[in-house]
C-alpha cells in the first residue's frame, strides 16, 4: 500500500522532469535555424489554420457574456461609464491569453501529439536517431516556436473580437453610450497590461507545445497509446496553464502599480 501511495508523486516528478528536459533540448537547438525553419513555417500555418476560426467563434460570444455580467453590475452601482474599463481589463489580462492557450492546446496541441505519436509507433523517431538526425531539433523545436508565435497573433485577435462583442452587447442591448464604453479603455488600462497579455500568450503557447511534443515522443501501446497520449496531453496542458497563469498574475500585481 505504501508503495502504491508513493509511486504516484514519484511518477509526477519524473514526468515533469522529462518534460523540462525535452523543452531544454528544444531551446538548445534554436540556434540551428537551418534545420527547423521550414518545419517552423509549416507548423505556424497549420496552427493558425486550425485555431483562427474557432477562436473567433469563441471570443465574440465570450465578450458578450463578460459584457452581460460587467454591464449589469455597473448599472447596479450607477457606474455605466466604467463598463469599458472593466471589459478591457477582464479580456486583455485574463480571458484572451487563457482562451488562446486552450484553443492552441485543444486544436493544435492534440494534432502535434497525434503526429509525433504516430511517428513514434511507426518507428520513424528511432529511424531518425539511427540516421543521426536529432528528432528534438527536427520536430520539437519548430513546434515550440510555432505555437508561441501563433499565440501572439491569436491573443490579439481574441482581444479585438472579444471587445467588439462586448461593444455590441453593451451599446446595442444594455444601451451604454459608445463614448462611455470607449472612454473607459484608458481609465484603468495601461501599457504593461498589453505586454502581460502577450507574455502570457507566448508562455502558454510554449507550454502547450512542450507537453504535446513530450506526450507524442513518449507514447506507447500502438494506436490506442496515441489516443491516450492526446487526451493526457490536453489535460496536463490545461493544468499547467491555469497554474502558471496564477503565478504570472500574482507577480504582475506585485511588480506593476495599478491605476485605481
Spans of features found by a protein language model:
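Hydrophobic alpha-helical transmembrane segments in multi-pass membrane proteins
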Residues: 50-63, 97-106, 146-167, 196-209, ...
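Hydrophobic alpha-helical transmembrane segments of multi-pass membrane transport proteins
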Residues: 83-126, 211
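Membrane-interfacial helix-loop-helix connectors in multipass membrane proteins
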Residues: 69-93, 160-202, 210-232, 251-260
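Short cytoplasmic-facing helical segments at TM-TM junctions of multi-pass membrane proteins
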Residues: 118-141, 223-226
Amino acid at each position: 500500500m505504501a508503495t502504491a501511495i508513493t509511486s504516484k508523486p514519484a511518477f509526477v516528478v519524473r514526468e515533469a522532469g522529462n518534460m523540462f528536459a525535452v523543452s531544454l533540448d528544444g531551446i538548445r537547438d534554436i540556434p540551428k535555424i537551418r534545420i527547423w525553419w521550414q518545419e517552423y513555417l509549416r507548423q505556424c500555418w497549420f496552427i493558425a489554420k486550425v485555431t483562427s476560426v474557432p477562436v473567433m467563434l469563441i471570443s465574440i460570444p465570450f465578450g458578450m457574456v463578460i459584457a452581460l455580467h460587467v454591464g449589469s453590475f455597473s448599472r447596479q452601482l450607477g457606474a455605466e461609464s466604467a463598463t469599458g474599463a472593466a471589459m478591457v481589463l477582464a479580456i486583455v489580462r485574463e480571458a484572451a491569453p487563457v482562451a488562446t492557450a486552450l484553443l492552441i492546446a485543444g486544436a493544435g496541441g492534440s494534432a502535434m501529439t497525434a503526429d509525433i505519436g504516430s511517428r513514434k509507433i511507426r518507428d520513424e523517431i528511432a529511424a531518425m536517431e539511427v540516421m543521426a538526425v536529432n528528432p528534438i531539433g527536427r520536430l520539437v523545436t519548430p513546434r515550440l516556436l510555432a505555437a508561441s508565435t501563433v499565440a501572439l497573433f491569436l491573443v490579439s485577435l481574441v482581444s479585438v473580437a472579444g471587445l467588439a462583442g462586448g461593444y455590441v452587447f453593451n451599446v446595442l442591448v444594455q444601451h451604454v453610450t459608445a463614448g462611455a464604453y470607449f472612454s473607459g479603455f484608458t481609465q484603468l488600462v495601461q501599457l504593461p497590461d498589453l505586454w502581460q497579455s502577450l507574455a502570457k500568450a507566448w508562455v502558454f503557447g510554449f507550454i502547450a507545445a512542450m507537453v504535446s511534443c513530450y506526450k507524442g515522443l513518449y507514447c506507447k501501446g500502438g494506436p490506442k497509446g496515441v489516443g491516450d497520449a492526446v487526451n493526457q496531453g490536453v489535460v496536463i496542458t490545461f493544468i499547467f496553464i491555469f497554474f502558471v497563469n496564477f503565478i504570472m498574475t500574482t507577480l504582475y500585481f506585485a511588480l506593476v502599480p495599478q491605476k485605481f
